[in-house]
Design a protein with these regions (language model features):
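Extended, low-complexity, amphipathic alpha-helical coiled-coil/linker regions that act as scaffolds
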Residues: 1-179
């Protein structure tokens, strides 16, 4: 036998299909359960590409019924809820109280997903700016509110909403995740 042994076995490739489906369903449910408009386009794109990768990895490593999966779903919901425009002073005060923990949890998720530093920094900066604009709504005259023109009302008949859901379902949804 030679010093280099060969085998007919191909290297094992991890199959993430079930994890991708679970992550897509969790993300879809989290978006659907969030009251208010759909997130801005840059948030949706980040959620489809990078955040879903985080959910896939947590699901793959820990499983559907795990505490880690429950935490991943929780931080997803909190992130989405934190960017919903509100005129309620109570809701804004709650956001101020919850932001430090949310930002810490988002950074942990980004690290787990091994998101590129430039993408991470860009997302966190845009998220900070969005949170600041949401918190300033109370101080602005009603005719000078924050421009939320790139958000989409949560209406299942809206083709933009359907397009988002289509990206979260099926093969088209998998093209956004690089494993």
């Amino acid at each position: 036998m030679s010093s280099i042994e060969t085998t007919d076995e191909a290297p094992k490739v991890t199959d993430y299909r079930d994890d991708i489906q679970a992550a897509s369903a969790a993300l879809r449910n989290s978006i659907a359960e969030t009251e208010g408009p759909l997130p801005p386009a840059w948030v949706v794109e980040f959620m489809l590409r990078s955040w879903r990768r985080y959910l896939v990895l947590v699901h793959h490593d820990s499983g559907q019924g795990s505490a880690a999966w429950a935490r991943a779903i929780d931080v997803t919901r909190r992130l989405l809820q934190s960017i919903v425009p509100t005129e309620s002073p109570e809701r804004r005060a709650q956001l101020v109280r919850e932001l430090p923990r949310l930002v810490t949890d988002v950074k942990i998720a980004i690290d787990k997903a091994q998101i590129d530093a430039t993408e991470r920094d860009t997302f966190l900066d845009q998220l900070r700016q969005l949170h600041m604009s949401l918190l300033k709504l109370e101080q602005m005259p009603s005719d000078q509110g924050t421009d939320f023109s790139d958000t989409v009302t949560m209406d299942v008949r809206d083709p933009r909403y359907r397009a988002l859901l289509d990206k979260l379902d099926g093969a088209e949804g998998m093209e956004h995740i690089e494993m």
